[in-house]
Swiss-Prot record:
Catalyzes the NADPH-dependent rearrangement and reduction of 1-deoxy-D-xylulose-5-phosphate (DXP) to 2-C-methyl-D-erythritol 4-phosphate (MEP). Keywords: Isoprene biosynthesis, Manganese, Metal-binding, NADP, Oxidoreductase. The gene is dxr. The keyword Amino-acid biosynthesis does not apply. The lineage of its organism: Bacteria, Pseudomonadati, Pseudomonadota, Gammaproteobacteria, Alteromonadales. It comes from Shewanella sp. (strain MR-7). This is 1-deoxy-D-xylulose 5-phosphate reductoisomerase. It is an enzyme of class 1 (oxidoreductase). Belongs to the DXR family. Mn(2+) binds at D149, E151, E230. It comes from the Bacteria. The keyword Metal-binding applies.
Length: 396
């Protein structure tokens, strides 16, 4: 029986994780649920899953949850960063699902890694912001790191065992691998007229053709910044050079990514677009459990198509690839800028095409400096957010 902590329990990854746990009740137990401020959602999850601990990042939300929870459930409610770190590093905890969106997930995820936990990484920003520090912490603690993102999980499944066992420190060429092919659907605006993009609304951007996701990641998919962040994450997870990574647009989202070998072979991972599949894989690796996902019906799939990304349509993807080549400081800046820009777009403060403008301005203007600690990363992240908000004021 594995005791699990779910960071981001009220989000879409949290819901999918709890679904897989419910399908395999003899193997997994919800030890703790962690959320930001969604009291009613957390209350419902507590009643259903009976965790020992419910942690709310927002202290007022924690008080509200405490007042609403039936006493007979005997669930401890906590709040505060120190309490969260104590929770993910507790000796009772076996596995941590790291699914808090954005930079907010970095500190607890890194704490779980340093404690040597089995970490299921759905928070791509952790590696985007702190790649080298994160990988070194994994190596030092002996933590098990498993990628939940559908693309990285697909790549992981297509890799030989010696690479799987050495994430972040592997040598792809020595294992006969020539390229990693990172697939992406192209999002809801793949075929829209370029001139129409400036007028696209948050509702349109969040209407993904294949996946069910939260608002931030949906917008990132529409700009293909999501694929850019995944490009950076793949660089750290699989220890790649930029020329070993390629982005391929695949609108049907049936092939979730591929690995190309030196002998000409290409191994692909396929399946219906449902996050329960990679979550179940990570939870049970190296075994297999039921995810509750319908098997892929090849007779219903029809045709599969592929094309190169158009960087005029997806400037955020180009910025991410460029930042990856520049190094850790640039990717930290880009991630922070993008979080501010996407939030502003979702709130109707800026237009869709302004997201790339804010990102580009920050990437070219925020001073970069060497980062040797988590404090350095957080400081650069904060500095970038201030500059990004200044750019928003100019666009308003």
């Amino acid at each position: 029986m594995q005791n699990m902590v779910i960071l981001g329990a009220t989000g879409s990854i949290g819901a999918s994780t709890l679904s897989v746990i419910s399908a395999n009740p003899d193997a997994y137990r919800v030890y703790a649920l962690v959320a930001n401020a969604s009291v009613d959602k957390m209350l419902a999850l507590c009643v259903t899953h009976r965790p020992q601990v419910a942690h709310m990042v927002d202290s007022q939300a924690a008080l509200a949850l405490q007042a609403k929870l039936p006493p007979e459930l005997n669930i401890q409610v906590s709040s505060g960063e120190d309490e969260l770190i104590a929770l993910v590093t507790a000796t009772e905890v076996d596995t941590v699902m790291a699914a808090i969106v954005g930079a907010a997930g970095l500190v607890p995820t890194l704490a779980a890694v340093k404690a040597g936990k089995r970490v299921l990484l759905a928070n791509k920003e952790a590696l985007v912001m702190s790649g080298e520090l994160f990988i070194e912490a994994t190596k030092a603690s002996g933590a098990t790191l498993l990628p939940v993102d559908s693309e990285h999980n697909a790549i992981f499944q297509c890799l030989p065992e010696e690479v799987q066992a050495n994430l972040g420190r592997c040598d792809l060429a020595a294992s006969g691998i020539s390229h990693i092919l990172l697939t992406g659907s192209g999002g809801p605006f793949l075929t829209a007229e370029l001139a129409s993009l400036a007028a696209m609304t948050p509702a349109q951007a969040c209407k993904h053709p294949n996946w069910s996701m939260g608002p931030k990641i949906s917008v990132d998919s529409a700009t293909m910044m999501n694929k850019g962040l995944e490009f950076i994450e793949a660089r750290w997870l699989f220890n790649t050079q930029n020329d070993q990574l390629k982005v391929v647009i695949h609108p049907q989202s049936v092939i979730h990514s591929m690995v190309q070998y030196r002998d000409g072979s290409v191994i692909a991972q396929m399946g219906n677009p449902d996050m329960r599949t990679p979550i179940a894989h990570c939870m049970s690796y190296p075994q297999r459990i039921s995810s509750g996902v319908e098997p892929l019906d090849f007779f219903k799939v029809g045709q599969l198509s592929f094309c190169e990304p158009d960087f005029n349509r997806f400037p955020c993807l180009a910025l991410a690839i460029a930042a990856c080549a520049q190094g850790q400081e640039a990717t930290t800046v880009l991630n922070a800028a993008n979080e501010i820009a996407v939030e502003a777009f979702l709130q109707g403060q800026i237009g869709f095409t302004h997201i790339a403008k804010v990102n580009e301005a920050c990437l070219s203007s925020v001073p970069k400096r060497a980062m040797t600690s988590i404090d350095d990363i957080i400081a650069l992240d904060a500095q970038t957010r201030i500059y990004a908000r200044e750019q928003l004021a100019k666009l308003a």
